């Protein structure tokens, strides 16, 4: 335990909280990146599926794993994508989502409900 004199000289250290989405930094709601690998992975224990994910290289940070939401996609290696924060609960290490309908990733085909989340324009 520190003495009063030590506390006067040094003070106590503030505990810094861990960032949930470190690749986005403080001021960026989204970042652009390039896909290095597009693949499927299986979720954690009670669930079963083939979830579509991509490794994305972000300049000035490194590589992160991002989830591709919706049914079907046109992503390949070297596709340019926009990522946002938001984890996938049953995929360990996946803390980002790729935004549909932005840059190289098309919106979901034949989507009628919740269109804004999947980058689909209003059909007339």
From Swiss-Prot:
Gene3D superfamilies in the cross-refs: Nucleic acid-binding proteins (2.40.50.140)
One BP term from GO: translation
Modified residues (3-methylthioaspartic acid): 90
Presence of the UniProt keyword Magnesium in the record: no
Keyword RNA-binding among UniProt keywords: yes
SUPFAM superfamilies with a match to the protein in the record: Nucleic acid-binding proteins
Transmembrane segment boundaries: none
Subunit record text: Part of the 30S ribosomal subunit. Contacts proteins S8 and S17. May interact with IF1 in the 30S initiation complex.
Family the entry assigns: Belongs to the universal ribosomal protein uS12 family.
Protein name listed in UniProt: Small ribosomal subunit protein uS12
Organism: Wolbachia sp. subsp. Brugia malayi (strain TRS)
């Amino acid at each position: 335990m520190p003495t009063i004199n030590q506390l006067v000289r040094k003070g106590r250290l503030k505990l810094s909280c861990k960032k949930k989405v470190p690749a986005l930094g403080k001021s960026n709601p989204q970042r652009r990146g390039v896909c290095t690998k597009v693949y499927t992975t299986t979720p954690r224990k009670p669930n079963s599926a083939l979830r579509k994910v991509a490794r994305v290289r972000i300049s000035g940070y490194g590589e992160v794993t991002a989830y591709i939401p919706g049914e079907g996609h046109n992503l390949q290696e070297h596709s340019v994508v926009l990522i946002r924060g938001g984890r996938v609960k049953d995929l360990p290490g996946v803390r980002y989502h790729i935004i549909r309908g932005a840059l190289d990733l098309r919106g979901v085909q034949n989507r009628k409900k919740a269109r804004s989340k999947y980058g689909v324009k209003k059909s007339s």
